[in-house]
């Protein structure tokens, strides 16, 4: 027997999962919430700032692994062969010469700019737009060619430029920046120094403008033209080589072996983004669109290199050789908000209840119980009477739009209301909106010649809310496979750990032994699909019209060229 542990670093918590490598049996699992994040520290939601303190990751990871190990027998603990890591992304942080995230140093302990900039942080909209403009200058190389043609404020270089401009102290102290999914394996293996870190193909290819065809990162002149402050503060290039996640970065170092009570020969596999590993954990095959559904969605599809050819798919979040499965092109898309939209509506409806609880504390237990039932009751009420002929049409841009064609300036829009629109109908409109966003992504692939043969959904919403999933199935007008495991991302990380440890020869072989089964396959209902088709066309019309209201206002180019002094470390 051999056991692998998968670590899945999400937006709110980290999950550890122990998996038997020959059978795929999920033996033990634990979820630990990030304590500082739970307190709302280092975030400024109205200004789209969301930061994670590295100690949240370290403390929660250690607790989660120890809880899992406590559930294993002594014999099972001795059979642990590898640890794999996935995380949200792009979630980068500035590090010093030893690879310490700056927030781990006393002088930066409470500085949000010295922490991990969470994927959904949208403080770098202007910087992202500047990168996109530079990529599209006539007569120059387009370094956005393989990331969909638009650089997002959620991504690596936009965040680096924003923080470097905003915080000279951080810019002075930072020797490099690193993605969370690369930092955790480096931490566990003791390879955190910038020159020792193995950069993952997944994060580098999808978020950092890295591509083999131009030798890695864009040339130094590209960053000089974007803003000289980047090359003044960071040594060019930050990195050159990248590695697929099946390649081990090392083994458990002495400190972490002691802290966890594990031997130092435990292999540490390379890191990747959560949804890419989730697709592997789901057992997805080429040309299967995998929707990893949570607060937002990430949509993953793999395709044979020969099928993709030299085609550059526009409007997505990148196409990268080996970002999901080695030797296949991994294509990424996603919705900036899915479950977050439902949660927003729950907060809106819950506001009067909060006020009542504040004035009548004795009622708080009953009020809290009622609030928990708001969304389930709305779902049930809408399912009984969906009234598709009178459904509000909603644009699902409550947190901007990731795909198709990223635009984080966009806002949610609700249309077609009348005096008969009640709470269940409005909630139904939100459900339909998230389904319409899913279809727009699928069509972004198919209309550019990338076949979608099957569609899979995974995650808590996929398994627990059939009403929402059936609406997605009807809108897509495709069978929708619901994956059995609700921890596919951690399962995928464990699969990569098993390959890195040598238990399986490659990822496809490991998937045959370890990947999740399909729990249920939903079928589209003809009548509902026909009505949703009409609503989807309305959604497209409103999308085209509304987007014009969020065009950026022309401003002089922002640059730090007036500060030419080179920063030293």
Curated annotation (Swiss-Prot):
Signal peptide: none annotated. It is an enzyme of class 2 (transferase). The keyword Kinase applies. Pathway: Carbohydrate degradation; L-arabinose degradation via L-ribulose; D-xylulose 5-phosphate from L-arabinose (bacterial route): step 2/3. SUPFAM superfamilies: Actin-like ATPase domain. GO terms for biological process: L-arabinose catabolic process to xylulose 5-phosphate. Pfam families: FGGY_C. It catalyses: D-ribulose + ATP = D-ribulose 5-phosphate + ADP + H(+); L-ribulose + ATP = L-ribulose 5-phosphate + ADP + H(+). Keywords: Arabinose catabolism, ATP-binding, Carbohydrate metabolism, Kinase, Nucleotide-binding, Transferase. InterPro entries: ATPase_NBD (IPR043129), FGGY_C (IPR018485), Ribulokinase (IPR005929). Its EC number is 2.7.1.16. CDD domains: ASKHA_NBD_FGGY_L-RBK. The keyword Magnesium does not apply. GO terms for molecular function: ATP binding; D-ribulokinase activity; ribulokinase activity. GO terms for cellular component: cytoplasm. Belongs to the ribulokinase family. This is Ribulokinase. It comes from Enterobacter sp. (strain 638).
């Amino acid at each position: 027997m051999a056991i692998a542990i998968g670590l899945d670093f999400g937006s709110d918590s980290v999950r550890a999962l122990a998996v038997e490598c020959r059978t795929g049996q999920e033996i033990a699992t634990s979820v630990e919430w990030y304590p500082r994040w739970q307190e709302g520290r280092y975030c400024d939601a109205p200004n789209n700032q969301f930061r994670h303190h590295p100690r949240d990751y370290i403390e929660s990871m250690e607790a989660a692994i120890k809880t899992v190990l406590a559930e294993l027998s002594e014999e099972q603990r001795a059979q642990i062969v590898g640890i794999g890591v996935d995380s949200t992304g792009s979630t980068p942080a500035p590090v010093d010469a030893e690879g310490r995230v700056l927030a781990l140093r006393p002088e930066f302990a409470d500085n949000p700019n010295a922490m991990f900039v969470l994927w959904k942080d949208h403080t770098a909209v202007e910087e992202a737009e500047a990168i996109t403009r530079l990529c599209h200058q006539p007569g120059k190389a387009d370094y956005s060619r393989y990331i969909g043609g638009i650089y997002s404020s959620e991504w690596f270089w936009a965040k680096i430029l924003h923080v470097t401009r905003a915080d000279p102290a951080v810019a002075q102290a930072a020797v490099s920046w690193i993605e969370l999914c690369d930092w955790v394996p480096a931490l566990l293996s003791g390879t955190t120094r910038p020159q020792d870190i193995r950069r993952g193909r997944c994060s580098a290819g999808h978020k950092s403008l890295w591509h083999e065809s131009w030798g890695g990162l864009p040339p130094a002149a590209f960053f000089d033209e974007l803003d000289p402050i980047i090359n003044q503060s960071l040594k060019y290039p930050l990195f050159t080589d990248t590695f697929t996640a099946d390649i081990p970065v090392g083994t458990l170092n002495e400190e972490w072996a002691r802290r966890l009570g594990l031997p130092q020969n435990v292999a540490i596999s390379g890191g990747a983004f959560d949804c890419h590993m989730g697709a592997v954990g789901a057992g997805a095959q080429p040309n299967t669109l995998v929707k990893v559904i949570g607060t937002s969605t990430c949509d993953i599809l793999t395709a044979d290199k020969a099928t993709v050819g030299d085609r550059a798919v526009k409007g997505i979040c990148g196409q990268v050789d080996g970002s999901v499965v080695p030797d296949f092109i991994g294509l990424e898309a996603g919705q900036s908000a899915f479950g977050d939209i439902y949660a927003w509506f729950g907060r809106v409806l819950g506001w009067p209840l909060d006020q009542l609880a504040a004035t009548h504390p004795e009622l708080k237990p009953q009020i809290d119980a009622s609030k928990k039932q708001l969304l389930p009751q709305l779902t049930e009420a809408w399912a009984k009477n969906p009234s598709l002929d009178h459904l509000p049409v909603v644009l699902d841009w409550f947190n901007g739009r990731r795909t198709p064609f990223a635009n984080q300036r966009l806002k949610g829009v609700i249309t077609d209301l009348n005096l008969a629109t009640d709470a269940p109908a409005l909630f139904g409109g939100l459900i339909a909106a998230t389904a319409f966003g899913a279809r727009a992504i699928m069509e972004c692939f198919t209309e550019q010649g990338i076949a979608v043969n099957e569609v899979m959904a995974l995650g808590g919403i996929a398994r627990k809310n059939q009403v929402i999933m059936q609406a997605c199935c009807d809108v897509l007008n495709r069978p929708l496979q619901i994956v059995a495991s609700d921890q596919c991302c951690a399962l995928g990380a464990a699969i990569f750990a098993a390959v890195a440890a040598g238990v399986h020869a490659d990822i496809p072989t490991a998937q045959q032994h370890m990947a999740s089964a399909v729990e249920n396959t939903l079928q589209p209902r003809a009548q509902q699909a026909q009505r949703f088709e009409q609503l989807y066309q309305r959604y497209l019309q409103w999308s085209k019209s509304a987007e014009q209201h969020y065009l950026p206002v022309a401003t002089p180019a922002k640059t730090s060229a007036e500060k030419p002094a080179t920063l030293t470390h």
